[in-house]
């Protein structure tokens, strides 16, 4: 199984820069998600790894093998031992499931047991004679995965393979696919615009912003320790409040809060991130910031409560809770903070309305 190494990769279309000096290391046998908005360049990066596109600059290595240096060395896609799962699955409608899976195999392999083994691996044993139109969307994606795994690739690339599935199917299918890839032992790279998908599936997540890797880390570290406020809001709901650093704590209208590990200003004004699940609600007599419930949304596994602090120094806060009776708008509650918070210097990459969506307009080819 091969690692993937990308160094200084750049790509432009018609004079418009799509990727600019991208560096990425994907360890052997790991699962990496490249997360970004539509038009951020993530699919272009995946196509360069696959060999469908050539970079304008930079190098791509699969293991120790140089497969593209943007000038002289180039190994075509069919010689890279890569499996590719496109967005729509792209099954051949006139071929049965078994023949779709066997499409990339040498003739002698077609007569063997490989197809049956793969269909069993993806949970579709016994469906070899069916046709794509007889399958659900989730089953079609699993056939596409089986086809990608058929030649025993060392690397599997997935280009937003779950985006066309119904929300009710998406979580279960991605869990199935993740399990299959783990069993196969292949190095896997997923590109997606779905934060939940990236955080739940990957060993490491690389966030692509404006054609460069803005941050790469484990899912939990990215979510808890984003590099700036803009990334914090891209990765999930975030309450951003003003504060002042004093020693090892930050003074805010929510109280004096412990700061998370990592680089932080030693003094002065900062932006403070409090995730919704860090906020705790109590009754009006509970110590904390006195607030009024504005709305309550129930989602089954949890609920989202929006509260407006009464002291005037705080914006509306988003709180995520589990259990308890529904909260009626107008109810007075006390709000407190649990755990350490992330801080950044004021003005350091502030969130911009529509910042991530604007990437879609900036780039139309990626």
Residue ranges and their predicted role:
Residues 35-37:
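The feature captures the beta-strand-to-loop junction immediately N-terminal to the Walker
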Residues 50:
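Helix-to-loop junction immediately C-terminal to a conserved catalytic motif
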Residues 56-59, 210:
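Conserved coupling/switch loops of ABC nucleotide-binding domains, chiefly the family-specific signature
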Residues 58-70:
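Conserved ABC transporter NBD signature motif
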Residues 81-83, 87, 91, 96-230:
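ABC ATPase nucleotide-binding domains
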Residues 238, 248-366:
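Non-catalytic connector elements of ABC transporters
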């Amino acid at each position: 199984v091969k690692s993937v190494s990308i160094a200084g990769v750049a790509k432009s279309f018609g004079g418009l820069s799509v990727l600019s000096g991208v560096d990425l290391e994907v360890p052997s046998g790991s699962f990496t998600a490249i997360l970004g908005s539509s038009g951020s360049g993530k699919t272009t990066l995946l196509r360069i790894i696959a060999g469908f596109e050539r970079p304008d600059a930079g190098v791509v290595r699969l293991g120790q093998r140089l497969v593209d240096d943007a000038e002289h060395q180039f190994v075509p896609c069919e010689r890279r031992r890569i499996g590719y799962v496109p967005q729509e699955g792209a099954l051949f409608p006139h071929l049965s499931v078994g023949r779709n899976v066997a499409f990339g195999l040498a003739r002698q392999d077609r007569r063997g047991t490989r197809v049956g083994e793969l269909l069993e691996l993806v949970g579709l044993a016994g469906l070899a004679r069916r046709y794509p139109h007889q399958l659900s969307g989730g089953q079609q994606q699993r056939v596409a995965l089986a086809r990608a795994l058929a030649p025993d690739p060392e690397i599997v690339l997935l280009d937003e393979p779950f985006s066309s599935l119904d929300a009710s199917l998406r979580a279960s299918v991605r869990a199935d696919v993740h399990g299959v890839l783990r069993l196969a032992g292949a190095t896997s790279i997923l590109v997606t615009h779905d934060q939940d998908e990236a955080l739940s599936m990957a060993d490491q997540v690389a966030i692509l912003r404006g054609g460069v890797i803005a941050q790469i880390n484990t899912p939990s570290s990215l979510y808890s320790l984003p590099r700036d406020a803009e990334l914090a809001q891209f990765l999930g709901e975030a309450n951003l409040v003003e504060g002042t650093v004093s020693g090892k704590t930050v003074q805010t209208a929510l109280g004096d809060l412990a700061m998370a590990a990592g680089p932080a200003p030693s003094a002065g004004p900062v932006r403070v991130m409090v995730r919704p699940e860090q906020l705790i609600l109590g009754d009006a007599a509970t110590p904390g910031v006195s607030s009024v419930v504005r709305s309550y949304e129930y989602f089954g596994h949890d609920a989202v409560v929006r509260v407006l602090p009464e002291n005037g120094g705080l914006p509306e806060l988003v709180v995520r809770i589990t259990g308890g009776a529904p909260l009626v708008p107008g109810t007075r509650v006390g709000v407190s903070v649990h755990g350490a918070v992330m801080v950044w210097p004021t003005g350091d990459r502030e969130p911009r309305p529509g910042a991530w969506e604007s990437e879609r307009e900036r780039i139309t080819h990626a």
